[in-house]
Amino acid sequence: MNEQVRSILVQETTKTSKIQQLFLLGVPRAEIARMVTNGNYGFVVNALRRMREREGGLNIHPATAALDYTFNRKFGIEIEAYNCSRERLARELREPGIEIMVEGYNHTTRPHWKLVTDGSLNGNDTFELVSPILVGEAGLRELEKVCWVLDLFDVKVNESCGLHVHIDAAGFSMEIWRNLALSYKHLEAVIDKFMPVSRRDNYYCKGLGHVSDEMIRSARTVDELKSRIGNRYHKVNLEAYSRHKTVEFRQHSGTTNFTKMRNWVLFLHKLVTFATREQVPAATALQDIPFLDSEQKLYYKQRTKKLSA
């Protein structure tokens, strides 16, 4: 296949023709964008759409079939905050039916929400609120109930607080792990712009810029990839896999706002879903992120504007 790819790339023909030939050969769209359009994923998508319209639809093989972004994935969330004692917050959360316990600092997954201590936080009555395993839209509805209580009792966040999201990674192949790490690395500059400055490269959520694409692509095991990225204090934490069979995303700023949480959880879900097929090309702009719909692109465009003001 490599020889066929090379022969297509050297043809004296249009980019559109090369894109269509490579697609029919089974080359992933992100790779086509890298090879033909200098990473312009949108150009590739448009070229293939025109081809489908002209030919009345393509018989697309499984490797390039449309991805299903329905949100039914397992996930977990950790909310760092302050300004309410753990005992009081637990009482108030039980009222709307949230099962919760006050515990000492631990990393054990529970079947209930837990309120634990966290020595990295600043403020009065600091705490970390950790969810049990949540699933899809039902999990988001439970999270929304929790956020109502946090808002009602004036729970606050500051720059020492973060929002950590765990996404189920059981069964990931090494191709998915590599695609995921590369995609986040390639989108890091875009993501940084819709995060506060305090979450762009602090000690507890360091970036991936120190890891070259080749170091990621050549990793043969999760442990090897984990050692190349570094310890758990990175925007993408692979250490969570050995303990919880999850991948942890640590970059989001502390918040009690459900809209922010929901959008970030869905962003990560779609990022992971996309990584099951391919990687996001380097230097992809926000408007060209292939897994976001127009509503989410608008949301993050507005977040970017607000944080740049």
Give the residues covered by each predicted segment.
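Short, Lys/Arg-enriched N-terminal segment that forms or immediately precedes the first helix
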Residues: 1-8
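C-terminal accessory/tail domains of diverse enzymes
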Residues: 30-31, 42, 49-156, 170-309
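Eukaryotic N-terminal low-complexity, Ser/Thr- and Lys/Arg-rich leader segments
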Residues: 8-11, 41
